[in-house]
Amino acid sequence: MRIFYLIIFCFFISFYIKAKTNYIVEVHGNIKEVKTHKYTETDNLKFLTINGTFKDNLGNFGQTNSLVYMLTKNNIVEKLESYNEFLYDNNIKAYNIATRSSEDLESGVGKWLYTYVSNEIKDLRNSSCIYSVSYFKSSFLAISKCNISETAFS
């Protein structure tokens, strides 16, 4: 009888717990400086654009573009925010905000938060992700990892 109750308990637990899976996105792109406000020799505000491509571990790929602002004080990037648009097949879109604080900038690690998404991928909305980024001249490579429900792209 104990086994029967254990099986029933496990069934209900598995029914109510949403399974989580890793959603990994790799982004490649080119950075272009649009405008700089140079306040002093060590302080400035830069506006950048990014155009590139992405692919994920679910077989999706597409184009991405970003609007970025970067605040530098005493030659140290104090704040960096990137507003990103991901364009999938069939006019599916996702938008996220990538942030990095001054502590995160040295390590090249930050956070993504998906803010707006098409209905086809609605489970991605409000997903928080960790990303890392590497630069080479005006190009970059970013990889993010998100924990999302298994139904997010089904």
Indicate where each model-derived feature is located.
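Sec-dependent N-terminal signal peptides
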Residues: 4-13
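Beta-strand-enriched cores of mature, soluble protein domains
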Residues: 19-154
